[in-house]
């Protein structure tokens, strides 16, 4: 299954890069909830991360850098092309991560960008999951003491970085046997095009890489990690893991420091706790990320999940959502996030 592994670890970053080249046609639901809060500001796109602090929203605009939204006005406050997420540290500083090929953690203070750690080198030297060496830092959360948690999607790992740039790994996520039914349906088996004909011969179930796309710190202090689930892009197979704070070198699936708190979602791309304590989980598309890549996107969702019971309810449906964040009063999400000229931020609750 070497081909499947290569697709699974690189699929997300490649898909997002490809989609910026054309407009995806989707149902008109981008104004679900309270409507756009980004006003006339035109993002370079794609939009990946969203954070809230001090009455402002901060958007990781992969085509430009970090954008601050306040009172319906947008301003680029730090140039950082390739940025995939931001996490405020205090009222003047934040962490930001970049995906492949840069693969770094940065600190931004009053608009000045400084390097903290080269995460790609850590993957090359340590390779926590022992698989193919690949790194695509995708999400970041700030911790006390100047530390940061980073979800590395291609490395299938949660990393922790000290303020001095020292990197260690917290946990790796396991493969899982998943159904190939959704893949075969999307590519049109048994009459798939030549590039996808191999999919029609796959068994009913194959191992899928987890693809750690998201991390959030819960009200209980625990660390929560969401998984996309890579090739073959199954539906209802993405999970959210709870990891005990302070954990190091855990292999989730066998370690007592990891437990699954949410199951049955599809292509998770972001996590964030709301003002009410619910875990907000973003699914980029209900038919999986592969549906988006193949131009068959339906709608994505933002869910509110109870991490005690595992129950989730849909807050809203949106086209191509990639991120969610909450202030003390409201919750916001990105929509049409991968489409140049159309990407924006909406209030959903």
What are these regions (language model features)?
Residues 22-39, 49, 337-338:
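C-terminal region of N-terminal signal peptides and the immediate post-cleavage residues
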Residues 41-56, 80-98, 102, 123-148, ...:
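Beta-rich, blade/repeat-based domains predominating
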Residues 97-103, 181-189, 202-205, 224-239, ...:
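Short, conserved, GDST-rich strand-edge loop motifs in beta-rich repeat architectures
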Residues 321-349:
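Blade-level signature of beta-propeller repeat domains, shared across WD40, Kelch, NHL, RCC1
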Residues 38-41, 74-80, 114-121, 168-183, ...:
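Beta-propeller fold detector
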Residues 2-32:
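Secretory targeting and sorting signals
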Residues 65-68, 103-106, 157-160, 169, ...:
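A short loop-to-beta-strand structural motif that recurs across blades of beta-propeller domains
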Residues 70-73, 108-112, 161-166, 244-248, ...:
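Short loop/turn segments that connect beta-strands within beta-propeller blades
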């Amino acid at each position: 299954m070497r081909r499947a592994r290569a697709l699974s670890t690189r699929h997300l970053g490649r898909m997002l890069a490809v989609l910026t080249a054309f407009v995806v046609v989707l149902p008109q639901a981008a104004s679900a909830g309270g409507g756009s809060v980004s006003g006339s500001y035109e993002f370079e796109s794609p939009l990946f991360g969203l954070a809230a602090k001090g009455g402002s929203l901060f958007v990781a605009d992969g085509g430009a850098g970090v954008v601050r939204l306040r009172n319906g006005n947008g301003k680029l406050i730090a140039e950082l092309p390739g940025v995939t997420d931001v996490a405020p540290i205090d009222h003047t500083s934040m962490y930001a991560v970049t995906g492949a090929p840069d693969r770094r953690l940065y600190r931004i203070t009053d608009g000045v960008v400084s390097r903290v750690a080269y995460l790609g080198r850590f993957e090359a030297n340590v390779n926590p999951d022992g698989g193919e060496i690949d790194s695509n830092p995708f999400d970041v959360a700030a911790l006390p003491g100047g530390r940061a948690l980073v979800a590395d999607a291609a490395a299938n790992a949660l990393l922790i970085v000290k303020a001095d740039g020292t990197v260690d790994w917290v946990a790796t996520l396991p493969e899982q046997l998943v159904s190939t039914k959704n893949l075969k349906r999307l590519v049109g088996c048994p009459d798939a095009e030549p590039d996808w004909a191999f999919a029609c011969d796959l068994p009913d179930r194959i191992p899928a890489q987890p693809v750690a796309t998201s991390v959030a710190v819960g009200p209980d202090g625990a660390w929560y990690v969401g998984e996309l689930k890579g090739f073959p892009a199954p539906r209802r197979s993405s999970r959210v893991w709870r990891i005990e704070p302070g954990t190091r070198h855990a292999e989730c699936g066998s370690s007592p420091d990891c437990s699954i708190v949410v199951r049955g979602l599809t292509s998770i791309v972001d996590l964030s706790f709301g003002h009410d304590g619910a875990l907000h989980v973003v699914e980029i598309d209900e038919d999986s990320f592969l549906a988006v890549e193949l131009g068959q996107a339906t709608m994505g969702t933002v869910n509110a999940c109870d991490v005690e019971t595992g129950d989730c309810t849909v807050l809203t449906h949106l086209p191509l959502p990639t991120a969610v964040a909450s202030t003390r009063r409201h919750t916001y999400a990105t929509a049409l996030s991968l489409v140049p000229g159309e990407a924006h931020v909406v209030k959903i609750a």
